[in-house]
Amino acid sequence: MRIFLSFIFFLFFSNSFAIEKLENAHAISMHGSPKYSKNFKNFDYVNFDAPKGGSIKLHQIGSFDTLNNFILKGSPVVNLSQVHDSLLTQSFDEPFTMYGLVAESISVPEDRSWVIFKIRKEAKFHDGNPIRVEDVIWTLNTLKEKGHPFFKFYYGNVKTAEKISDNEVKFIFQGERNLELPLIIGQMKILSKKYWEDKFENVLLESPVGSGPYRVKNFKAGRTIEFERVDDYWGKNLSVNKGRFNFQKVIIEYFRDATVALEAFKSGDYDFRQENQAKRWSNAYNFTAIKNGHVKKESVKHEIPTGMQGFFINTRKEIFKDRVVRKALNYAFDFEWTNKILFFDQYKRTGSFFSNSDLAASDLPSKEELELLDPFKNQLPNEIFNTIYENPINDGSGDLRKNLRIADKLLYEAGWIIKDGKRINESTGMPLKFTILLVSPEFERIALPYARNLKKIGIETKVRTVDSAQYERRLEDFSFDMTVVSLGQSLSPGNEQKDFWSSTTAQINGSRNYAGVSSPAVDFLIDEVIAAKNRESLISATRALDRVLLWGYYVVPHWHIQNFRIAYWDKFGQPKINPKYDLGLDTWWYDNDKIKLLEP
C-alpha cells in the first residue's frame, strides 16, 4: 500500500476513561479527551505567524508513472496526501485524536456503532465545486469496490454510508466492536466524484482535482513533480491548519541512485534530506557546506514506535512452512557484527513488532495476556507462555560459529540434513535454497554477508536487486522468497493489523501480509486489538499479538533508531516545539534572512 496514511500515535490512558457519547463535537479521541478545546487557536508545535512563501526542494529514490495512488496499478508519486483533504486531521503531540477538517462536527453514540459528520459549507475542491455528501459516499464505495485491495479490508466494517441531510453523512458500522472506526473513516481522503468518476481505475498523468492545501502544478513522470500552495485554499484559516503548509512551492526530484542523490544535495540541487543509512551519516556529511554552517546536520529525537524492519520470510513457500526452519534462519544473521562494522554502532536490534513503545512484549505474559492466549495453547509454541523472546546474540567479532551450530541442530531436528555440502530435506530430497529480493543495491552489503553465513550451513542463498517498479509488483503478488520490509506501527494499532497478519489477507494480492501469516490465534488477537475498550486492554491484546508473531519467526528482525537523522540547507525557520510523533516538516517556513547569508 503506497498511499499510506500518516501514522497515528497514542500515549498512556488508564482503564478509568470511558467512551463518551459525542454530539456535534469538534474532535474525537480513541480514549480520553482531546487536548485542544473547541475554539483553540493552533497546535502547540506550530508558529501561528509563520510567513508564507518560498520553496522547499525534496528528493525521492525511485520513479513514478501515475498521480493516482488509490489503485494497485502503477507506481504513484509521493506527497499526494496534501492534495486531498480528509474529514478529520490528527494532531502529533497527543494521543490518537482527530480534529475536524472537512467535517465541521462529529457525533457518535457510546458504542461507536455509527458516526455522523457534518460537512463544512465552505469546503470545496480546487475547481470551485463544493465538497458534497455525495462525494463522501461515492469515495467510500469506490475505494472499497475498485480501489487498492487495502481499502476493502481497512473499511470492511463500514456497512453503509447514508446521506441524512444536505451536509450530513452517516456511516454505519458492522462486525465486532471497533471503537477506532469513526477515526479511521475520518482519515479517508475525499475525492471529487465529478472529476474521478471516469478516471478512477486508470493510471493518471495529469494534475488531479483535489481539495487540500496544495495542487500539482507540473511534473515530468519519473523525474520531478512540483506542488504549489493553493492561495484560495478553503481551509487555510482553520485552527488545525494555522502555521502549516507555509511553502509556496514543494518540489520533489526523483533519483534512481542514492549516491547520486546525495551528491546532488551537496551541490544544493535540493534542500532537505532524511538520512536512512548509518554509514553515510557517519562518513558522508563532512563536505564544505557542513563545515561552514550552510548545511545543518541534526539528530531529532522522537517518540514514534519504530515497528519492524527485517528479512520477511514468505511462508507461502513450501521450504518456509516449518517454524523451526524459520527460527534457524535468525541464528545465521550476525547483527552485532553488522552494527559494529557497517553501522558504527548506531542501532539497536529490534525485538518486537511494536518496538519503542509500551505495546512491545518485553516481559513474561501478564494474567490478562494469558487469558487471551490460553484458548490457543495447543496451537502455539510453549515458549510464548514461559519465555521472554530474545534474538540470538553474538560478540561482534564476526565469528558466528556458535550460532551456526545452533542453526544446524535446529535444521536437523526439522528433517533438513547435509548431503554433499547442501542442505536438503531428508524425506523429499528438496534442497533448502532461496533468493533474497532487494530494491536497493545499498542493502546488498547487509544481505550478502547473511547469505554467506547461510551457505556455511548448506543453504544456497542468492541476492537479487531489481528496480522499484518490479519490486513493487513482486511484493504485490508475493513473488519472492525473502525480502526486506519495514512495517511501521502506531501507538494505536487497529484495522491495519488485518492487512499485516490476517488469514484473510494472506492470499490477497496487494495486501501487506508479506509473510503470509495465517493463524487462528493471530486472527483472534487482531480482533481483540481492534475491539479494545481502553488503553489497558489494548496493551494486553497487542502484547499477546506481538508474542505470537515473534515466536512464529516470520521475520529475521533487523534494527531501529529512535531519532530522525536530517540534513538541510540553512534557509528555513522552525517552530520552537517539535511534535512528539512526527518530523513536522509542514510547519517549517522559508526564511529570507537566512537565504541572504547563503548568498556568495
Question: Positions of the model-derived regions?
Answer:
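Ligand-site clamp/hinge motif
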Residues: 120, 202, 235-285, 327, ...
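N-terminal lobe/hinge region of extracytoplasmic solute-binding protein
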Residues: 20-111, 118, 141, 145, ...
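Gly/Pro-rich hinge or "lid" segments in bacterial periplasmic/extracellular proteins
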Residues: 63, 83-94, 185-249, 256-260, ...
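Detector for C-terminal structural segments
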Residues: 22, 60-62, 75-78, 82, ...
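Ligand/substrate-recognition segments at binding pockets and active sites
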Residues: 40, 274, 383-489
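Aromatic- and charge-enriched surface segment that lines or borders ligand/interaction sites
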Residues: 46, 50, 71-79, 105-149, ...
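Extracellular/periplasmic solute-recognition and catalytic clefts
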Residues: 160-163, 217-228, 253-317, 324-328, ...
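Surface-exposed binding/hinge segments that line
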Residues: 118, 152-197, 201, 211-220, ...
